[in-house]
Curated annotation (Swiss-Prot):
Transmembrane segments: none
InterPro entries: Cerato-ulmin_hydrophobin, Hydrophobin_sf
Organism: Metarhizium robertsii (strain ARSEF 23 / ATCC MYA-3075) (Metarhizium anisopliae (strain ARSEF 23))
Gene3D superfamilies recorded: Hydrophobin
Signal sequence range: 1-16
Function statement: Aerial growth, conidiation, and dispersal of filamentous fungi in the environment rely upon a capability of their secreting small amphipathic proteins called hydrophobins (HPBs) with low sequence identity. Class I can self-assemble into an outermost layer of rodlet bundles on aerial cell surfaces, conferring cellular hydrophobicity that supports fungal growth, development and dispersal; whereas Class II form highly ordered films at water-air interfaces through intermolecular interactions but contribute nothing to the rodlet structure.
Subcellular compartments: Secreted; Secreted, Cell wall
The name this protein goes by in its record: Class II hydrophobin 3
Amino acid sequence: MKLLAVAALLAGAAIAAPTSNTGGGSVCPSGLYSNPQCCSTVIIGVIALDCKSPSEVPRDGTDLRNICAKTGQKAACCVIPVAGQALLCETAPGA
């Protein structure tokens, strides 16, 4: 019985271990702000309006900035959008 409890504990620890998946690749940091977006306005580096996914897959923050600049928008790393709006964002690294 103790062996089963120890095996379950080890299996749980292995499943809960962090991986190298960052969501946005090398564009955005892992965690909450992991979704690369192109936004028309980023206010105080926290609130973003009219955000859309980039038209191409960016390689890094500079590439995201260039992709967004083609449409006159700013590169941002956002929380998962709710109702099509990404409200909580920060400026993308390298942008």
